[in-house]
A protein has these predicted regions:
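Membrane-interface helix-loop junction between the first two transmembrane segments
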Residues: 1-15, 147, 155
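Membrane-helix interfacial "entry" motifs
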Residues: 7-11, 15, 44-48, 80-84, ...
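Bacterial Type III/flagellar export signals at protein N-termini
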Residues: 14-20, 274
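Membrane-interface helix-loop-helix modules in multi-pass inner-membrane proteins
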Residues: 20-93, 112, 195-198, 224-225
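Long, contiguous internal "core" modules enriched in hydrophobic/ aromatic residues
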Residues: 70-248
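Membrane-helix interface "capping/anchor" motifs
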Residues: 248-256
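Central hydrophobic cores of alpha-helical transmembrane segments
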Residues: 257-263
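Single conserved hydrophobic/aromatic residue that forms the stacking wall/gate
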Residues: 264-274
C-alpha cells in the first residue's frame, strides 16, 4: 500500500511477485521439515517455546494466498484496499517475528530437558519481546524491505520504481544502523554469550544432558580473536547493503539486487564459540 498509490500501481506490484510468492512460501515449510529431520530437539524446543510467535506468523501468512486470489474478485475500492493491507501484514509480520526469534536465540532461551529429553520452555511470551530481540527484528525487517525494494526497482519503471528505490535506500540505511548498533550493544552492553565447555565427541550420540556451557560477556568475540578472517562476515554485511544502495541509486538495479543477496547471505553467518 505504500509503493503503489492507486489500484493500477498496486496491481503492477502484485504482478511482479505473483509468479514466485507461492514457491518462496514453500521454503518455510521445507525449512521446518529440515529442522525436524536434522535437529529434532531444536525443532521441539523452538516450536513449543515460540508457540504463540509461530502462530502469529502462521496467521499472518494466511493473508497471502487469500489476498492474491481474492483481491481482484470484486471491483470495490474498500474490498481491494482491505486485501492490500492484508498482503502487507502477511509480508511484514513474518520477518519481524523471525528477527525477534533469532535475537532471542543469540541471547539464549530458557528451557530444560527431563530424563526423557522432553523439552520444557520456562519463559513467557512477553520475555521474548526484549529490547535486543526487538532490535534484531528491526534488522530483519529492514533487510527484507530493502530486498523487496531492490526487486521492485528491477522489475518496474516510472513512479513505482522511483518509490521502490527510495524505500530500498531508506531500508538499507536503517538496516546498517541497526546492524552496527546491535554489534556495539553486544560489545559494550553486557549481553552474555555462550561457550561450550564440555568435550565434543563427533562420533558419540547426541546427548544435550551431557553437555555444559558457560556464559560470558566476552564469549561473542572468542572466535573473532582466534580467526580474525571472521570479521569479514559482518563487514560484508554492511558493505553489501551500502553497495546495493549505491547501485540502485545509479539505476543499476540488477547489480544492486545481486549485491543485496550477497549481503543477506553474509548476515546469516553466526560462528559458534567453542573452547
Amino acid at each position: 500500500p505504500f509503493v503503489g498509490r492507486n489500484d493500477v500501481e498496486r496491481r503492477v506490484v502484485i504482478n511482479t511477485v505473483g509468479p514466485h510468492w507461492d514457491g518462496n512460501q514453500v521454503w518455510f515449510i521445507t525449512g521446518g521439515g529440515a529442522i525436524f529431520a536434522a535437529w529434532p530437539l531444536v525443532y521441539a524446543t523452538a516450536f513449543s517455546g515460540f508457540y504463540w510467535a509461530m502462530l502469529v506468523v502462521l496467521w499472518a501468512l494466511f493473508f497471502r494466498p487469500v489476498g492474491f486470489d481474492y483481491r481482484s474478485k470484486i471491483h470495490n475500492a474498500t474490498w481491494r484496499s482491505t486485501w492490500d493491507w492484508g498482503l502487507f501484514i502477511g509480508g511484514a509480520v513474518p520477518p519481524l517475528i523471525f528477527g525477534v526469534a533469532f535475537g532471542n536465540l543469540l541471547q539464549g532461551v530458557p528451557f530444560g530437558f527431563d530424563d526423557y529429553l522432553i523439552s520444557t520452555y520456562t519463559g513467557t511470551f512477553w520475555q521474548l519481546l526484549n529490547p535486543f530481540a526487538l532490535l534484531a527484528g528491526v534488522v530483519s525487517s529492514a533487510m527484507i524491505t530493502m530486498h523487496g525494494g531492490m526487486y521492485l526497482a528491477h522489475r518496474t519503471e516510472g513512479a513505482i520504481q522511483q518509490r521502490a528505490i527510495r524505500g530500498a535506500v531508506g531500508a538499507a540505511a536503517l538496516m546498517v544502523l541497526a546492524f552496527v548498533g546491535a554489534g556495539l550493544w553486544l560489545k559494550f552492553g553486557g549481553i552474555e554469550g555462550f561457550v561450550i565447555t564440555s568435550a565434543i565427541d563427533p562420533g558419540a550420540l547426541p546427548d544435550p544432558l551431557a553437555k555444559t556451557v558457560a556464559r560470558s560477556a566476552d564469549a561473542w568475540w572468542l572466535n573473532y580473536r582466534a580467526q580474525p578472517l571472521l570479521w569479514l562476515l559482518p563487514a560484508l554485511g554492511v558493505a553489501g547493503a551500502l553497495a546495493a544502495a549505491a547501485l540502485v541509486l545509479a539505476r543499476r538495479t540488477l547489480s544492486a539486487f545481486v549485491a543485496r543477496s550477497e549481503e543477506h547471505t553474509s548476515e546469516l553467518q553466526s560462528p559458534l564459540n567453542i573452547s
